[in-house]
Curated annotation (Swiss-Prot):
GO terms for biological process: decidualization; extrinsic apoptotic signaling pathway via death domain receptors; negative regulation of protein catabolic process; negative regulation of transcription of nucleolar large rRNA by RNA polymerase I; regulation of apoptotic process; spermatogenesis. Pfam families: DED (PF01335), TRADD-like_N (PF20694). One of its GO terms (molecular function) is DNA binding. It comes from Mus musculus (Mouse). Residues 25-103 form the DED domain. Residues 128-191 are annotated as: Disordered. This is Death effector domain-containing protein. It is found in: Cytoplasm; Nucleus, Nucleolus. Keywords: Apoptosis, Cytoplasm, DNA-binding, Nucleus, Repressor, Transcription, Transcription regulation, Ubl conjugation.
Length: 318
């Protein structure tokens, strides 16, 4: 445990220079991917490479990170070649880890800005409607949204307003007013965003299906490994339970934010289990345990949040 704590707290030597460029080091990527690999995943991976990794090297593998380091020492993975790692993750159906096999740092999601904006805008719209207030106070709610707030700037709406060209011919004052009125965005016409949801059901473990069914009597170690590799790949493909990809449309920021929080805290996963893991699916897999994997694209959420924030800003315009 002390060694694990030491490795988690220390920075890899090659990572100091790459942090300035927004990149992970190869070993930091091993840490990220390896922590998500279960002990069963590591056992299956070690079983596939039993002819490549010697007994001493295999005895040092205690987790996913150690296995990836062993791949690097065998020359099967480096900063410019992740093909072997990606292929192995697909074989053990850990498609949820594929986006993490990269040296590019993932942007952190900061929902605090949304919370702050929703809180301020709710004060702005609810306060004037309060019946207990004896006299209206219009200047006070306008101060709740500071002018330097970062989401107040809306260049996209401005570009839309400037994208329409004036009509040909002479321009009168009346036509200018009509055109100005038509260019002004209608608050009722809200922008919507699509969030892609990926749901996949798979077996919890594949070790029992692989044992006794993967065999090769070829003399060459490399040919023997490839034959075992192809056999395991065929078996795992036959055990594929399928996946579903759907786009969910949102028009309200509160619903989008609630959806993202349910995804982060696992509530969405628990709710989808009752929908996708049905009795017919349980009967099809028999006594084997199955699990559900849910993935939502972080970039879709960020872009959708920006669109819906612009809707709120258009509503706030006088």
């Amino acid at each position: 445990m002390a060694g694990l704590k030491r490795r988690a707290s220390q920075v890899w030597p090659e990572e100091r220079g790459e942090q300035e460029h927004g990149l992970y080091s190869l070993h930091r990527m091993f840490d990220i991917v390896g922590t998500h690999l279960t002990h069963r995943d590591v056992r299956v991976l070690s079983f596939l490479f039993v002819d490549v990794i010697d007994d001493h090297e295999r005895g040092l593998i205690r987790n996913g990170r150690d296995f990836l380091l062993a791949l690097e020492r065998q020359g099967r993975c480096d900063e410019s070649n992740f093909r072997q790692v990606l292929q192995l993750l697909r074989i053990i159906t850990r498609h949820d880890l594929l986006p993490y096999v990269t040296l590019k740092k993932r942007r952190a999601v900061c929902p605090d800005l949304v919370d702050k904006y929703l809180e301020e805008t709710s004060i702005r719209y609810v306060t004037p409607r309060a019946l207990s207030d004896p006299e209206p106070r219009p200047p006070q709610p306008s101060k709740t949204v500071p002018p330097h707030y970062p989401v107040v700037c809306c260049p996209t709406s401005g570009s839309q307003m400037c994208s329409k060209r004036p009509a040909r011919g002479r321009t009168t004052l009346g036509s200018q007013r009509k055109r100005r009125k038509s260019v002004t965005p209608d608050p009722k016409e809200k922008q919507t965003c699509d969030i892609r949801l990926r749901v996949r059901a798979e077996y919890c473990q594949h070790e029992t299906a692989l044992q006794g069914n993967v065999f090769s009597n070829k003399q060459d170690p490399l040919e023997r490994q490839f034959e075992r590799f192809n056999q395991a790949n065929t078996i795992l493909k036959s055990r594929d339970l399928g996946s579903i990809i759907c786009d969910i449309k949102f028009s309200e920021l509160t619903y989008l934010d609630a959806f993202w929080r349910d995804y982060i805290n696992g509530s969405l996963l628990e709710a989808l289990k009752g929908v996708f893991i049905t009795d017919s699916l349980k009967q099809a897999v028999g006594h084997e345990a199955i699990k559900l994997l849910v993935n939502v694209d972080e970039e879709d959420y960020e872009l959708g949040r920006q669109k819906l924030l612009r809707n709120l800003m258009l509503q706030a315009l006088p």
